[in-house]
């Protein structure tokens, strides 16, 4: 069991482990627990009642957080033709076609997200799948990063659209803002994510879907959240 310092032990005493907090209570408390010298990211962790070994029970989706994540997202766009100008006008940080594919293949990784038009996916799959796939950066229609509307995809990512998916233990981890956010904005982002997660419930998943949820900041202890009966149905 890892040993925690005096600062962390003092923080964890502020969390009542024998109760579950509403998101509004937790959003206010997490700000009090974020005492690091930087603006900590606030994350939520959902444990799902799924069998992640079965492909028909895996959960994946996207959600536009109404107040964004507080992070500046650097977006790379792989496209060609008129879409180049459209991507640049939408605020993409780097845009290119085969030239950008080659740059990335040669080590260029100065971006946080990659979007592409369908006509570039064959080359991306051939040259970049092994590089971007393990990093979670490979464009995919399910994550809203492949499509004809490059401007819309770029604006969505810049505005705070995030992708969520379960890990191999059936847990979804997702950022919902920064410790500097107003608690009401953290709560609104959480509710948007919760709604998207409920909508993404696999038909093959039986029993209680949302088993538990915790709110935490980068350096702070986790706060157990209450889940309504409706959310667990």
Swiss-Prot record:
Keyword Lipoprotein: no
Gene Ontology CC terms, in alphabetical order: large ribosomal subunit
Keyword Zinc-finger (UniProt): no
InterPro entries linked to this entry: Ribosom_uL1_bac-type, Ribosomal_uL1, Ribosomal_uL1-like, Ribosomal_uL1/biogenesis, Ribosomal_uL1_3-a/b-sand, Ribosomal_uL1_CS
GO molecular function: rRNA binding; structural constituent of ribosome; tRNA binding
This protein's UniProt keywords: Repressor, Ribonucleoprotein, Ribosomal protein, RNA-binding, rRNA-binding, Translation regulation, tRNA-binding
GO biological process: regulation of translation; translation
SUPFAM superfamilies (alphabetical): Ribosomal protein L1
HAMAP family given in the database record: Ribosomal_uL1_B
Annotated function: Binds directly to 23S rRNA. The L1 stalk is quite mobile in the ribosome, and is involved in E site tRNA release. Protein L1 is also a translational repressor protein, it controls the translation of the L11 operon by binding to its mRNA.
Subunit structure and binding partners: Part of the 50S ribosomal subunit.
Protein name as it appears in the record: Large ribosomal subunit protein uL1
Gene: rplA
């Amino acid at each position: 069991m890892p040993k925690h310092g005096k600062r962390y032990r003092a923080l964890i005493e502020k969390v009542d482990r024998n109760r579950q907090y509403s998101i509004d209570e937790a959003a206010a408390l997490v700000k009090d627990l974020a005492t690091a010298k930087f603006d900590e990211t606030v994350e939520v962790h959902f444990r799902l009642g799924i069998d992640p070994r079965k492909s028909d029970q895996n959960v994946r989706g996207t959600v536009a957080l109404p107040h964004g994540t507080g992070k500046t997202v650097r977006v790379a766009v792989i496209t060609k033709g008129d879409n180049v100008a459209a991507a640049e006008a939408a605020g993409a940080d780097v845009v290119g076609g085969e030239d950008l594919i080659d740059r990335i293949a040669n080590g260029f990784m100065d971006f946080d997200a990659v979007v592409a038009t369908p006509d570039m996916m064959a080359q991306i799959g051939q040259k970049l799948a092994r590089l971007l796939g393990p990093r979670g950066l490979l464009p995919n229609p399910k994550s809203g990063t492949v499509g004809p509307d490059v401007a819309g995809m770029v604006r969505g990512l810049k505005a705070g659209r995030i992708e969520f998916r379960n890990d191999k233990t059936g847990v979804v981890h997702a950022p919902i803002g920064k410790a500097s956010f107003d608690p009401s904005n953290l709560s609104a982002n959480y509710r948007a994510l919760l709604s998207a997660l409920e909508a993404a419930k696999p038909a093959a998943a039986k029993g209680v879907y949302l088993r538990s949820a915790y709110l935490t900041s980068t350096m702070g202890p986790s706060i157990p959240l209450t889940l309504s009966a409706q959310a667990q149905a």
